[in-house]
Amino acid sequence: MEWIIAGLLAVIAFVGGIFYRKSIAEGKIGSAEDRARQIVDDAVKEAEAKRREAVLAAKDEVHQMRIEAERENRERRNELQRLERRLLQKEESLDRKMESMERKEDNLQRREDEIEKLRAGLAETLQKQVAELERLSGLTSEEARTLLLSNIEDEVKHEAAMMIKTIENQAKEEAEKRAREIISLAIQRCAADHVAESTVSVVALPNDEMKGRIIGREGRNIRTLETLTGIDLIIDDTPEAVILSGFDPIRREVARIALEKLILDGRIHPARIEEMVEKAQKEVETRIREEGEQATFETGIHGLHPELIKLLGRLRWRTSYGQNVLKHSIEVAHLAGLMAAELGADPILARRAGLLHDIGKAVDHEMEGNHVSIGIDLAKKYRESREVIHCIAAHHGDEEPRTIEAVLVAAADAVSAARPGARRETLESYIKRLQKLEEIADSFEGVEKAFAIQAGREIRIMVKPDKVDDAESLRVAREIVKRIESELEYPGQIKVVVIRETRAVDYAK
């Protein structure tokens, strides 16, 4: 029984436990449903909030887009309005221009009509005038045209001649300027000595007793020396000196060397004098050859005949107007070579011809003829080229220069001779030449004063303005030049300057 009761109690407890657990489970389920409903409600609320936020954001974006669109529309409207105003302005400007063009066309048409009327009137008047001119002149229109063309042709020829003269003058000025530049450059690059030659030589003596020994018993020593050398010995009161006088520099040099050797040796008698003169002659011959070789070395000339070299050396003791001829020849060679190089000519040929241009002066006192013809003969004899021979022949105008080298040699010769200090004259002949120069200028009518300046290389003539006009001044200058060339002998050239001055003087009171 107890077991039944216990079983019942167990069943009841089991059933009760089941119901209890069921009630607990139902309570939990209800609580979960509540939470689920709460979660759903929260989610719904959150979604609603987000929806509202999204709606607000969308509304803001739409609002901003609307504002931006309105701004762009305003800008476009403003741009369109500005373009419309510009178009209106252009249309107004075009309208004004069209009106102006129409007015101008009207004016042009009116003027064309007037011009056409004038042209027609002028043609009619011209026909009448031509007919009247033909009647008065007795010439037809064709004859008048021929006469007019002839006059025009003369005028054109005159204008062409004036133009040609102007061009020639410009060309001459340019050529003279270029020539001056070339000559100046050549002179600057060529160093030359001034004249220092003389017709006497002085031999110093150790004492005055030597003068008696030189004279010798009854003058036999001095006579022997003078006879052998052809030089005058001047023994005067000059202390401790003997003067050798002679116009042949080579003989004077032989006498000087022989006398110096005799003085140094101390034995002075005719036999010894003959011996010393012979030695001096050999020494001078050696020096002549050395001087010629030195000249060819200085000028860079090679291949000269030995006899021509000796003749060049003889020029060392030859002078012209006091100018040493060998130094002059070397200077001419340098100048001609420099100018030839500047002009694109043959500088070697110019230097060779310049060095040999005065070779005839070495023996012109021994042979007949002037130094030009003698130089030509010598150049032919010693096989110089035709170009060199032509330069020698043309340097003083004996032949017309046919080559540029011949012209340059003649120009270099004139420059070397005419430069200040190159040549000199005796004082007496110099003064006479200046006086004669001024006398020639004073002899012309209208000349007020004449002054020879620049050592006689220029004369300035003052003329009276009331008697000599500008054109007459040119004639006076040419006439004076002709008189100088025909009546005077002078080295180089003389510049003639005629000055005509007009002064107007008044006084303010």
Swiss-Prot record:
UniProt cross-references to InterPro entries, sorted A to Z: HD/PDEase_dom, HD_domain, HDIG_dom, KH_dom, KH_dom_type_1, KH_dom_type_1_sf, Ribonuclease_Y, RNase_Y_N
Matches recorded under SUPFAM superfamilies: Eukaryotic type KH-domain (KH-domain type I) (SSF54791), HD-domain/PDEase-like (SSF109604)
KH domain mapped to chain residues: 199-262
Entry GO MF terms: RNA binding; RNA endonuclease activity
EC number(s) reported in the record: 3.1.-.-
SMART domains reported for this sequence: HDc, KH
Annotated membrane topology: Single-pass membrane protein
GO cellular component: plasma membrane
Sequence intervals crossing the membrane: 1-21
Keywords: Cell membrane, Endonuclease, Hydrolase, Membrane, Nuclease, RNA-binding, Transmembrane, Transmembrane helix
Keyword RNA-binding belongs to the record: yes
Cross-referenced CDD domains: HDc, KH-I_RNaseY
Domain called HD: residue spans: 325-418
Primary location recorded for the protein, binned into one broad class: membrane
Subcellular location: Cell membrane
Swiss-Prot/TrEMBL GO biological process terms: mRNA catabolic process
Pfam family, one: HD
Role this protein plays: Endoribonuclease that initiates mRNA decay.
Stored PANTHER family: RIBONUCLEASE Y (PTHR12826:SF15)
Similarity annotation: Belongs to the RNase Y family.
Entry protein name: Ribonuclease Y
Organism listed in the record: Heliobacterium modesticaldum (strain ATCC 51547 / Ice1)
Taxonomic lineage: Bacteria, Bacillati, Bacillota, Clostridia, Eubacteriales
